């Protein structure tokens, strides 16, 4: 088990679904890099630095997990990090088509980079960052969907936005 894997995403914010997949990946691979994409086209609520910090807090108990922000092509980031595997999550069949296209594009751009798909635990299969932000925006309790530190950060971020 000498494989370096990257689990890429925007993580705006990191959810229990993401954390579940990170835990699973950490058991499968020697070293897991959580690649947090700058991704300005998604207009993230949290800055890249804030997202890196939140993911670091949520994954602090995992010795073989490293959190790194990046911009640019994922395949270039994977090469820089000497990773041979991309970990992707599949919540539902609806995720598969996009992930399949992405995996094929990544394979075309970097033939030695393998994509591995993991599914979250059933209780996390419906959670997305978008839904969590939507619930929080309307005053709902997101504590069952995110780590307590993420819930606090999200509440503070929304309070600032309303001020």
Curated annotation (Swiss-Prot):
ATP binds at residues 10-11, 18, 89-91, 99, 124-130. Its EC number is 2.7.7.3. Its main location: cytoplasm. Pfam families: CTP_transf_like. GO terms for cellular component: cytoplasm. The record marks 18 as: Transition state stabilizer. Substrate binds at residues 10, 42, 74, 88. Pathway: Cofactor biosynthesis; coenzyme A biosynthesis; CoA from (R)-pantothenate: step 4/5. Its cofactor is Mg(2+). It catalyses: (R)-4'-phosphopantetheine + ATP + H(+) = 3'-dephospho-CoA + diphosphate. GO terms for molecular function: ATP binding; pantetheine-phosphate adenylyltransferase activity. Reversibly transfers an adenylyl group from ATP to 4'-phosphopantetheine, yielding dephospho-CoA (dPCoA) and pyrophosphate. Homohexamer. This is Phosphopantetheine adenylyltransferase. It comes from Shewanella oneidensis (strain ATCC 700550 / JCM 31522 / CIP 106686 / LMG 19005 / NCIMB 14063 / MR-1). The lineage of its organism: Bacteria, Pseudomonadati, Pseudomonadota, Gammaproteobacteria, Alteromonadales.
């Amino acid at each position: 088990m000498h494989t370096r894997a990257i689990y890429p995403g925007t993580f705006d914010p990191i959810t229990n679904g993401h954390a579940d997949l990170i835990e699973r990946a950490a058991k499968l691979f020697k070293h897991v890099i959580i690649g947090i994409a700058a991704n300005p086209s998604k207009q993230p609520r949290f800055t890249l630095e804030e997202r890196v910090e939140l993911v670091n807090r949520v994954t602090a108990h995992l010795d073989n997990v490293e959190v790194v922000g990046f911009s640019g092509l994922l395949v270039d980031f994977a090469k820089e990090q000497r990773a041979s595997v991309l970990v992707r999550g599949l919540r539902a069949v609806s995720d598969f088509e996009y992930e399949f296209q992405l995996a094929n594009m990544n394979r075309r751009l970097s033939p030695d980079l393998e994509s591995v798909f993991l599914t979250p635990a059933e209780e996390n299969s419906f959670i997305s960052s978008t839904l969590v932000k939507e619930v929080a925006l309307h005053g709902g309790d997101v504590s069952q969907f995110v780590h307590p530190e993420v819930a606090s950060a999200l509440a503070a971020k929304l309070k600032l936005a309303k001020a």
